[in-house]
Amino acid sequence: MAIPIRTEKEIVKLREACKLASDVLVMIEPYVKAGVTTGELDRICHEYMVNEQKVIPACLNYHGFPKATCISINEVVCHGIPSDDKVLKNGDIVNIDVTVIKDGYFGDNSKMYIVGGETNIRSKKLVEAAQEALYVGIRTVKPDIRLNEIGKAVQKYTESQTFSVVREYCGHGVGTEFHCEPQVLHYYADDGGVILKPGMVFTIEPMINAGKKEVRVMGDGWTVKTKDRSHSAQYEHQLIVTETGCEVMTIRDEEIAEGRISRIMVNV
């Protein structure tokens, strides 16, 4: 497979797009509260992206997707379509996935929110484990290792926490296209011999379930739910492989303050 190696000029553009994408997730947080609809959250994000940031919402009309963001609640694994009929309630766990296009370059990220700040013990642990699963993947990235080392590490951690890794959806290359090579699986499998090299840009975005790994696509052709109706959680970052590890291009200030990952990860 032909995996693009980004030039310094491209990297500058990607950093800009990624910062804008991460800013949307920070901006929307105060609005994620009981009584608000996912349709309203999407409109706030959409207007902020278009009017304030002057960027293009990448999800809107992508293969026919009707909204600017994906918003997935509780047992929805991914690709939840925002709707004025979906009202948030305290205890819901919510993923908001935002991708922006700035000057032809894509920035892609997502994070979890807990409505009201509290949920049941199992779902709280799930959300925490989803973030740590992403971080485990990020800490694995360095040049000259096999791509599938990422999935191996993510799967090992996730299953150690008594959760399961969704198989049907994966991380992906991203740059001047929304999705390109490589496919970044979050479980251990054949990777075709791909070796990570500096300048490769991709997302890591494990979706993990409180119950079994199996999922189903709903009648709208987009919304993916767990088959057993257990809750699901996901965090996503976009990163670039460096000479000594990776740069997390969509990192948020809150994460830097926590200290579990940094913008520049030295993993060698």
Swiss-Prot record:
Pfam families: Peptidase_M24. Belongs to the peptidase M24A family. Methionine aminopeptidase type 1 subfamily. It is an enzyme of class 3 (hydrolase). This is Methionine aminopeptidase. Binds 2 divalent metal cations per subunit. Has a high-affinity and a low affinity metal-binding site. The true nature of the physiological cofactor is under debate. The enzyme is active with cobalt, zinc, manganese or divalent iron ions. Most likely, methionine aminopeptidases function as mononuclear Fe(2+)-metalloproteases under physiological conditions, and the catalytically relevant metal-binding site has been assigned to the histidine-containing high-affinity site. A divalent metal cation 1 binds at residues 97, 108, 236. It catalyses: Release of N-terminal amino acids, preferentially methionine, from peptides and arylamides. The gene is map. Keywords: Aminopeptidase, Hydrolase, Metal-binding, Protease. The keyword Cell membrane does not apply. The keyword Hydrolase applies.
